């Protein structure tokens, strides 16, 4: 029963389950029964896998948004990572709904006239979605934390990660520095929205970045 109903939301539960599966495989190894051999071939699937949907902002904010929104609206346990470059990177750096207001990119040479679509806010409005932003170059411990929390949440999870791109116009050798500046300037605030905190009577919103200390240039 422990093998079938093991709690594997946290790392300790997964480690315990690996131990149970190892014991099961040891016992099955001594049997020549076809059913035992069949079970041994699939026993490792009793260990919970970490599965993520990964896509860029062109997919998440624009051409694939309808499907993404449908998934987030449902109560299923699914993890989604959006790598947000704020432009259509694969096709040369054109303006997208992820591009912030005033930004210069292809198709908005005079500066984008409309605001960036707030994907994280839209997702958090559902109330049952775990939502977080991340920028590992600015705060790697926060990035690790949001992945851990998203993985452990029994429902839809969305992480929107700031992703430097050559279309931004700087040498990619400095991508971590650019992430740091994006957070320090307030361009990319780091936060978490965890519905579990609301269920416990607390505030589900946690701001992980400090007040802006750098100008936006």
Q: Where are the regions a protein language model picked out?
A:
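N-terminal leader/propeptide and maturation segments of large enzyme subunits in energy/redox metabolism
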Residues: 1-38
